[in-house]
Amino acid sequence: MNHTTKKCLITFMIVLFSMSFLFPSVSSARNHTSYAASTASVPSGQYYRSQEVALHSHVQKASLYYTTDGSQPTTQSQLYKKPIHIETDTTLKVSVYKKNRRLSTSTYNYRFVTREDIASSFLSFEYQGMPYRLYIPKNHKRGKAYPLVLFLHGGGERGTDNQKQLLANDGAALWASPEVQKKHPSYVLAPQARNAVDGGFALTRNSQNEIDLTNVFQFSPDLHKAYDVLQHVLTSYQIDQKRIYATGLSQGGFGTYQLNITYPRLFAAMIPIAGGADPSKAGILAHKPIWAFHAEDDSIIPISYARNTIQAIQKAGGQPLYTEYASKYGYDHASWTPAYETPGLTDWLFAQRRSFR
């Protein structure tokens, strides 16, 4: 290499080095854009419940402007100050600005499903004369066992249509909702009891079909059938035997207690709502993870049923979680509405695993 060639090569390298400062690489530019982009506490996806979306940017002293109609945000758009409440299909666009200069724009798409949508994803079966619905986790993997949530409905959902137990409330829908299944893929089982005087997962009516709680602690015929349905499902699918859960409301609340007392080693945890257990037997549940709910002004199932049950469990050394809604809220015999909306409830349930005491 002669002197002239060396000189040209050195000059070229100096120019190239200088240009690297004037024109950052594509990779660097992308990294800068990524750093400047906003982040959302709730990712894009499908949801059943309304969401509170918190926004954040790593850029110091930056301002976030957003729109919820899919249009490009400007400094004239809504300035982000607090979490954004979203409950309908929404395209959220967020732009990060600093000194009136837009650094990035991010798009988040939220789509919502209805209870009917969720119900349609349940399979429909009948076993030994009892209708039941079963949700199978999407994209379940062969050879992998998944948890199962058993839901026992109340007296108003009795029948043979195999639908009311899914559509009347969130007792089954919640566990099969997109956001819960994404975090905790699981089976959801919802049997349906007969609409008869002695029908239901607890005996709450007399021969005149009037509310009568005299025999409410008896193991009802339909609860026996529900247990058989559960056993059938447990042997037919790959269920994690350490993560079988029970929840129920009203008649189903009593049934949830009764199943756990009769088969104390079957369930990992339980969520009984507006129900109760025989205080003389409730001590059996001392080591069971329980989160119970009841309304103080319940006009159908008196609050004493829940209080007496919880006190009996505590006396036996148990530490059940118990949420009682004061009369001022007016929930009456519908405490399952706020109960199934309790923050952290689903995470709490799926965190429980059966022990072998």
Task: Indicate residue ranges for each PLM-predicted region.
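Sec-dependent N-terminal signal peptides of Gram-positive bacterial secreted proteins and lipoproteins
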Residues: 4-29
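Short, compositionally stereotyped local motifs that mark structural "simplifiers"
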Residues: 30-116
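A domain-start/cap signature at the N-terminus of enzymes
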Residues: 30-33, 40, 104-148, 186, ...
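Active-site machinery of serine-nucleophile hydrolases
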Residues: 148, 155-223
